[in-house]
């Protein structure tokens, strides 16, 4: 399993994402922290920041932006993906500062992408829901879905492949076409339980078990 960071480092990243967004919404400036954990400067993993609005016991997507193959280093990728999630996701209006107490932050650290160069009919065996995220590319089209999306939606492997194709604005069966490139990756995911409260590491396989009950 891909787990490059400790829980303490994950907490730092989630709190960083929140504090950067708060500063940006308050002052319109991007604040770079002093003396961050050294590994976050030395590493350069893909990073996505997800922001969700708390709706009772449910969570509604508020924004999600990231860098599949990194940006400068993990620290900078977290900072700029957080700003993107709050204010640059084209699906949503920019966040307002007063929303901060009603949203949770989640930071996903992505492993390097691995191209599946095999018979597409074998993808149903090679792709594992609860472990893998997907990237689909064909020509100018591309789409990415994080591994937690398939778990949250209780998708089968085939449904996951179909939805990733659709995310790329391609036919749902694009994964069966050899012109389509399919990449898998893993993610280490850190998340707030409640707005600005405890940060934990998600166990997607444990969450997936609830889909099967």
From Swiss-Prot:
Pfam families in alphabetical order: AMMECR1 (PF01871)
InterPro entries noted in UniProt: AMMECR1, AMMECR1_dom_sf, AMMECR1_domain, AMMECR1_N, AmmeMemoSam_A, Uncharacterised_MJ0810
AMMECR1 domain mapped to chain residues: 8-201
Disulfide bonds: none
PANTHER family: AMME SYNDROME CANDIDATE GENE 1 PROTEIN, AMMECR1 HOMOLOG
Name used for this protein in its record: Protein Pars_0011
Species of the source: Pyrobaculum arsenaticum (strain DSM 13514 / JCM 11321 / PZ6)
């Amino acid at each position: 399993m891909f787990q490059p960071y400790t829980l303490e480092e994950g907490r730092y990243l989630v709190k960083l994402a929140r504090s950067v967004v708060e500063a940006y919404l308050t002052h319109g400036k991007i604040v770079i922290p002093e003396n961050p954990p050294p590994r976050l400067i030395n590493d350069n993993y893909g990073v996505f920041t997800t922001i969700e609005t708390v709706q009772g016991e449910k969570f509604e997507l508020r924004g999600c932006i990231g860098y599949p193959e990194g940006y400068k280093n993990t620290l900078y990728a977290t900072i700029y993906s957080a700003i993107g999630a709050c204010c640059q996701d084209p699906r949503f209006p920019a966040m307002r500062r007063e929303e901060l107490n009603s949203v949770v932050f989640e930071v996903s650290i992505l492993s390097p992408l691995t191209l599946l160069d095999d018979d597409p009919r074998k993808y149903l065996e090679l792709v594992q829901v609860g472990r893998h995220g997907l990237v689909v590319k064909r020509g100018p089209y591309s789409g990415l879905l994080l591994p937690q999306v398939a778990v949250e939606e209780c998708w089968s492997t085939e449904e996951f492949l179909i939805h990733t194709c659709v995310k790329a604005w391609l036919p749902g069966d694009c994964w069966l076409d050899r012109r389509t490139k399919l990449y898998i990756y893993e993610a280490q995911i850190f998340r707030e339980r409640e707005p600005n409260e405890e940060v934990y590491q998600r166990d997607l396989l444990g969450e997936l078990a609830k889909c099967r009950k």
